[in-house]
From Swiss-Prot:
Family: Belongs to the adenoviridae E3_20 family.
Entries under InterPro entries matching the protein: Adeno_E3_CR1, Adeno_E3_CR2
Ranges annotated as spanning the membrane: none
Keywords linked to the UniProt accession: Early protein, Glycoprotein
Keyword Transferase: no
Protein source organism: Human adenovirus B serotype 3
Name this polypeptide is given: Early E3 20.5 kDa glycoprotein
Residues of this chain annotated as glycosylated in UniProt: N73, N137
Function: E3 proteins seem to be dispensable for virus growth in tissue culture cells. They are potentially important for virus growth under special conditions; E3 region may help adenoviruses to evade the immune surveillance of the host.
Amino acid sequence: MISTTIFIITSLAAVTYGRSHLTVPVGSTCTLQGPQEGYVTWWRIYDNGGFARPCDQPGTKFSCNGRDLTIINITSNEQGFYYGTNYKNSLDYNIIVVPATTSAPRKSTFSSSSAKASTIPKTASAMLKLPKIALSNSTAAPNTIPKSTIGIITAVVVGLMIIFLCIMYYACCYRKHEQKGDALLNFDI
């Protein structure tokens, strides 16, 4: 039971690891970079789990050039999660809008990542609502580790921990009943 809980928490942490958090002031313009190759489809994921394609919305609030999404004159309505994918690679952004008097980072294009614990339930909800969109991020800078590699390493470590716990359990139970012979080690012919 504990190993299952650890596996679920580790999996959710690996999924939210690549989310980029961006703080922008009200009234500014922000450009979100999509994956490098192919045509990118952008999705906006709302807090309630719903989603929409910002490039298909009427008006001049969102500008898409095939790869990047530009949000013009940001208000608090544009705060939330944005997801860009070319169905092979993806990038995930969390935009936090602050009042214009609050200082914000000068660079409006963001590509580093950090994850908050409060984003895990929102990410899980969004994953359940978007089954056709692949949630893998294999476009990485040369000095960063892709999410798929982190997921594989995490799965191997959890698997080895389970095997180790099973071996320890077997060793402890076998010591209690030393008079019993081990059927696997009995070679009587």
